[in-house]
A protein has these predicted regions:
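Aromatic- and glycine-enriched pocket-lining scaffold segments that form the walls
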Residues: 1-32
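Outer-envelope exported proteins of Gram-negative bacteria
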Residues: 4-6, 106, 139-141, 178
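Outer-membrane beta-barrel and related beta-rich outer-membrane complex signature
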Residues: 17, 80, 117, 150-158
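Detector for outer-membrane/organellar transmembrane beta-barrel domains
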Residues: 24-131, 142-144
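Acidic/polar low-complexity surface segments
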Residues: 74-75, 147-151, 158-163
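Short loop/turn motifs that connect adjacent beta-strands in outer-membrane beta-barrel proteins
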Residues: 132-138, 169
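Extended amphipathic alpha-helical coiled-coil/heptad-repeat regions
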Residues: 141, 150-156, 166-168
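Outer-membrane beta-barrel "beta-signal"
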Residues: 167-183
């Protein structure tokens, strides 16, 4: 078991147009528990009345590993000036190991913000890893993101003034092939 926390001081710079608004501290807490095939975790972040709370679990039995993640967000003023509201997010994952091969599948969902209609998105991923050794593997995966008309998860469509801009409602997909080596 381990737990940790942090405080980030003055995470919002003073706005000259709002001289009475102070700078806010950000707070983070996390706890994790590992016991054999079971791994559990929880996390909480808070900043300027915005928060996220999350729970996760992972369980391995034989050649199978299954995992789940749940997160609750509340945004009063960070994403939109008036706040996007609240939402729930989740992810389910699975892995099957056969000799040096790993087969992966997962799906994640970010539900719509309560104050932003049609802002949900769903991501699907299929992957395959082949372990060449304990430290080296080759991998490939395909992922697809389906955005609601007011959601913009995925890749940037352009950049302006050093800001990444994503267009709402665009669906994205990607394919990857690579090698990973841990030194």
């Amino acid at each position: 078991f381990w737990a940790g926390g942090s405080v980030s001081f003055h995470e919002k710079a003073k706005d000259p147009a709002k001289p009475n608004e102070g700078r806010k501290n950000a707070y983070d807490l996390a706890a994790n528990y590992n016991n054999g095939p079971l791994s559990l975790g929880a996390g909480y972040s808070y900043w300027n009345s915005n928060y996220q709370a999350a729970l996760r679990g992972l369980y391995t039995f034989g050649q199978f590993t299954v995992g789940a993640y749940y997160q609750r967000n509340k945004d009063d003023n960070a994403i939109l000036g008036a706040g996007a509201g609240s939402r729930n997010n989740f992810r389910l994952s699975g892995m099957y190991v056969l000799n040096a091969s790993e087969f992966h599948v997962n799906v994640g969902r970010a539900n719509s913000w309560s104050k932003v209609d049609d802002s949900a998105a769903t991501q699907w991923t299929l992957g395959y890893n082949y372990n060449l050794s304990k430290r080296t593997k080759v991998y490939t995966y395909y992922t697809k993101v389906n955005n609601g008309k007011n959601a913009s998860y995925g890749y940037a469509t352009k950049a302006e003034n050093n800001n990444v801009i994503r267009a709402n409602g665009l669906n994205t997909s990607s394919f990857a092939l690579g090698v990973r080596h841990n030194f």
